[in-house]
């Protein structure tokens, strides 16, 4: 699986490109399954903070910082708690088209002290109303624990 190491790559989320569809496979107990379907990867949006490499202690309301994509129209940033519930979802964050890192201050409900969180950013292209995700941050980055 492409998601289980920090290698600067993510499964390409652009569904307008052949071979990028999410593949789901049900494996009956004790049976072998052969897969003929592949998938494509693309460069991930690099997380700068918090949680660029390891979970990071955050003592104030966080600002999420990640590398700017060069071809996005806007971003979406979603914050999850330790059990995977969405605690904040910000869409239509303006892109800079490759002009330095993107900084997004957290503007959701108060975070719970001692809770682990993760932010994920997705770059979005909007071509004549057709919305297409083109890259995102890696699944194992952007982790932080809130401790005011």
Annotated model-derived regions:
Residues 26-62, 147-148:
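Short, compositionally biased P/S/T/A/G/V-rich stretches that sit at domain boundaries
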Residues 7-8, 84, 131:
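Residue-level signal for glycine
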Residues 16, 126-147:
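Extracellular fibronectin type III
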Residues 45-51, 72-80, 117-120:
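Secretory-pathway ectodomains
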Residues 68, 74-112, 126:
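Recognizes extended acidic, P/S/T-rich segments that occur
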Residues 60-72:
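Conserved aromatic anchor
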Residues 1-3, 111-129:
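Beta-strand-rich modules
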Residues 4-36:
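Structured interaction patches on ligand/partner-binding surfaces of diverse proteins
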């Amino acid at each position: 699986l492409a998601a289980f190491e920090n290698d600067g790559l993510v499964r390409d989320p652009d569904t307008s490109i052949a071979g990028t569809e999410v593949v789901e496979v049900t494996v009956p107990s004790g049976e072998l399954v052969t897969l003929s379907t592949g998938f494509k990867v693309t460069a991930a949006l690099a997380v700068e903070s918090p949680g660029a490499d390891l979970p990071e202690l955050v003592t104030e309301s966080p600002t999420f910082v990640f590398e700017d994509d060069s071809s996005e129209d806007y971003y979406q940033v979603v914050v999850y708690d330790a059990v995977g519930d969405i605690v904040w979802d910000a869409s239509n964050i303006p892109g800079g088209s490759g002009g330095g890192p993107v900084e997004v201050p957290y503007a959701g409900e108060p975070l719970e002290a001692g809770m682990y969180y993760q932010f994920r950013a997705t770059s979005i292209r909007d071509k004549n109303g057709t919305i297409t995700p083109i890259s995102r941050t890696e699944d194992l980055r952007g982790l932080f624990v809130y401790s005011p």
